[in-house]
């Protein structure tokens, strides 16, 4: 979703987000807006023999999600990947770590999540990358044509490139566990619900509860309020409770406070650029000038007692 569309969507659900105390916005790192991208920061979050979690900020100023799990023996599992403009950087990173991706998960059919993979698929022999399988559950094309016609052509192009690639494609099922060994597993928690027509593509995000050497991580994609509420109603609490939570929809206008209260995370990962963190309209009008709800979410995390927050205005390596 482009920033202009993101702004339009945010304006439909709220006017201006209220300010919260500075403690709510405290994150492990906040580089100055406009500075050059600093080197990746590292932090110990899991410990022991855990897979490393590489969280990549976008190579543009737009919203995106790009996540890599890397095992002690060098195995790779990807989630999303970002925009097409992120593809070249991501390809280089994956090749730096051996160039063999066991599984590539895509959470939903928005370009800031799947387009980087699409660009890699266009390259001869995928730019030297080997991909074992792609796991996705996108909404049906005829449904996308009804609820988000501006997305249709982009999704069709990507699915066409994926079909031509010859890669193995799997559709996740609720309760399916993907066990990668070395202490890493992904459990699928939900499926698309065609009754959700408001914010339909975001609400189709497939969420995974990841176990990494005994630590639990909830991957939320861009899950919206409706799907988040359904998961709270229908899932046992132990399926949602997680040590670490990816903030849904880049930290605003996604899942609600009740969802995060059910998750009860100790640490949060914000796939949120600086302008969105600051609620800065167009990234140039100053903090608090935008229609975004980020500050509400910051307040919720403060009230829920979250201990650590990682802001993706830079790359992070969590081990």
Regions found by a protein language model. Name each.
Residues 5-27:
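N-terminal export signals
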Residues 29-99, 169-240, 316-319:
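Core dinuclear metal-dependent hydrolase active-site scaffold
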Residues 62-63, 84-86, 109-115, 141-144, ...:
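Active-site environment of divalent metal-dependent phosphoester hydrolases
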Residues 74, 84-136, 234-252, 264-269:
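Active-site metal-binding motif and surrounding structural segment of the metallo-beta-lactamase
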Residues 89, 115-119, 157, 230, ...:
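Extracytoplasmic/secreted proteins, especially bacterial periplasmic and envelope-associated proteins
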Residues 115-124, 145-152, 257-260:
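Metal-dependent catalytic neighborhoods of phosphoester/phosphodiester hydrolases
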Residues 133, 141-202, 267, 272-319:
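Binuclear metal-ion centers of metallo-dependent hydrolases, dominated by the metallo-beta-lactamase
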């Amino acid at each position: 979703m482009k920033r202009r569309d993101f702004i339009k969507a945010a304006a439909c659900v709220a006017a201006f987000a209220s300010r919260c105390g500075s403690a709510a916005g405290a994150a492990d790192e906040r580089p100055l807006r406009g500075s050059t991208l600093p080197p990746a920061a590292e932090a110990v979050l899991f410990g022991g023999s855990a897979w490393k979690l590489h969280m990549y900020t976008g190579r543009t100023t737009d919203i995106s999600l790009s996540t890599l799990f890397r095992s002690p023996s060098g195995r790779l599992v990807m989630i999303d990947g970002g925009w097409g403009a992120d593809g070249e950087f991501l390809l280089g990173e994956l090749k730096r770590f051996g160039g063999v991706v066991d599984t590539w998960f895509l959470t939903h059919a928005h370009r800031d999540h799947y387009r980087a993979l699409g660009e890699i698929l266009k390259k001869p022999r995928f730019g030297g990358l080997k991909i074992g399988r792609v796991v996705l559950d996108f909404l049906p094309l005829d449904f996308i044509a009804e609820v988000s016609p501006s997305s249709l052509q982009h999704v069709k192009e990507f699915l066409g490139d994926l079909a031509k690639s010859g890669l193995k494609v799997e559709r996740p099922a609720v309760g399916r566990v993907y066990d990668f060994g070395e202490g890493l597993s992904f459990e699928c928690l939900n499926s698309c619900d065609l009754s959700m027509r408001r914010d339909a593509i975001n609400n189709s995000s497939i969420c995974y509860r990841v176990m990494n050497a005994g630590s639990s991580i909830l991957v939320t994609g861009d899950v919206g309020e409706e799907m988040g509420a359904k998961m709270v109603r229908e899932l046992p609490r132990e399926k949602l409770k997680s040590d670490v939570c990816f903030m849904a929809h880049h930290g605003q206008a996604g899942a609600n406070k009740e969802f995060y209260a059910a998750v009860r995370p100790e640490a949060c990962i914000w796939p949120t650029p600086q302008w969105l963190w600051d609620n800065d309209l167009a990234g140039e009008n100053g903090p608090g000038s935008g229609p975004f709800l980020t500050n509400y979410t910051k307040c919720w995390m403060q009230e829920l007692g979250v201990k650590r927050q990682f802001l993706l205005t830079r790359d992070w390596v969590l081990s």
